[in-house]
């Protein structure tokens, strides 16, 4: 009979949190939240201190997460261009979409035009880096999606900027 092996203590994993970008780079996180027959895409832009600079959201007539995340990335890039930011980190938790934007994989046909347009937009910045982020570090973008889902928006693919008076409601989420 063998003797029992001692149980070694485990080291807890460090918490996954949003990381600040360098001072001259704006970080734009994109997210998607699907419902039964539609979804909400969001883009949250923050500076090097984590302060929200702009938040936008859009209801889309698709619950497909791949399509929703591709459209969210496109909306995040359009937000960055509209604000005339020269350098951005484009962060999302869809690894597939990030790979498509980086040129590491070919996008499936149902989103290829959105990916193509997004890659063209990426080239409009002085520098732009599509980066995958763990969903736990993308909570702010997902919180905006859930908030917008409650607003009963129209399915017209119109991106709306969150009024600055409401941005403060999400200030706590920006600390994550």
Set out the residue ranges of the language-model regions.
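Primary recognition of RNase H-like, Mg2+-dependent phosphodiesterase/nuclease domains
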Residues: 1-176
């Amino acid at each position: 009979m063998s003797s029992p092996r001692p149980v070694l203590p485990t080291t807890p994993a460090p918490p996954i949190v949003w990381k600040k970008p360098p001072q001259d780079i704006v970080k734009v996180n994109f997210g998607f939240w699907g419902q039964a027959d539609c979804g909400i895409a969001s883009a949250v832009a923050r500076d090097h201190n984590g302060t929200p600079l702009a938040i936008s959201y859009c209801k889309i007539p698709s619950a497909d997460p791949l399509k929703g995340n591709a459209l969210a990335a496109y909306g995040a890039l359009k937000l960055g261009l509209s604000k005339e930011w020269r350098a951005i980190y484009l962060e999302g938790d869809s690894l597939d979409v990030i790979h498509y934007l980086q040129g590491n994989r070919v996008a499936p046909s149902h989103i290829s035009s959105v990916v193509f347009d997004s890659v063209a937009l990426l080239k409009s910045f002085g520098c732009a880096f599509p980066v995958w982020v763990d969903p736990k570090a993308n909570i702010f973008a997902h919180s905006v999606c859930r908030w917008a889902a409650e607003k009963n928006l129209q399915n017209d693919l119109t991106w709306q900027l969150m009024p600055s008076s409401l941005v403060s409601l999400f200030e706590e989420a920006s600390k994550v």
